Amino acid sequence: GDLPVPRTRKDLLDPRYRDRIVLFGKDRTEISNATFLYIYKEFGMDGIRSLARNVKHALHGAQMSRMAGSANTEGGAVYLVSWFFAKTCVKPNVEIVWPEDGCMTLPMYLLVRKDRLEAVRDIVDYFVGVEFAAACSRAFFPAANAAGGGLLPPGAKLAWLGWDYLRSPD
């Protein structure tokens, strides 16, 4: 249609997208908080309210991948989905957009008890190593070791909330 393609997080707040955005979540009512953290940091509560008006509902990434570009009335015009699920949506009328202000990232944690580190050293080394990073990259998932990656689109940026922000009491 005549709806412009959003290129930044700020674009998602525009009233023209009212009830047209589908976010990643467990189901139609349980939405991942990741997007809201970024919107709140950049645009405050006004940004949260604007985004909330524009969100139709949430779907799992696999559902979004199947629904995007279809005539299904449960779908939306814009889907915020992980790169993996975006890459599985190969349809001529769907455009995958890497945000100009960077793709939102969230850290994954590998927690190991200090007294057990040596017992599981091989496993830890594998998960932070080049081989696992390369496998993640081939599956369009970020990895802990940049040396094994390299499959991001040219000029792709990543957005990161920052530890200081996440640790702040607000």
How would you describe each model-predicted region?
Residues R20-K26, F127-L151:
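Periplasmic-binding protein-like
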Residues R20-F24, E30-D101:
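Ligand-binding pocket segment of bilobal, Venus flytrap-like solute-binding proteins
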Residues G44-G47, G129, G162:
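Glycine-centered helix-coil hinge/cap
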Residues K10-L13, F36, Y40, V120-V128, ...:
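Non-transmembrane alpha-helical segments in soluble domains
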Residues G1-L23:
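A conserved helix-loop-strand patch within extracytoplasmic ligand-binding domains
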Residues D2-R7, Y40-G47, D115-V120:
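Short helix-loop capping/hinge motifs at secondary-structure junctions, enriched
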Residues G1, T105-A119, A135-A139, A144:
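A bilobed periplasmic-binding-protein/Venus flytrap-type ligand-binding module shared by bacterial periplasmic
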Residues L151-D170:
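Extracellular/periplasmic bilobal clamshell ligand-binding domains
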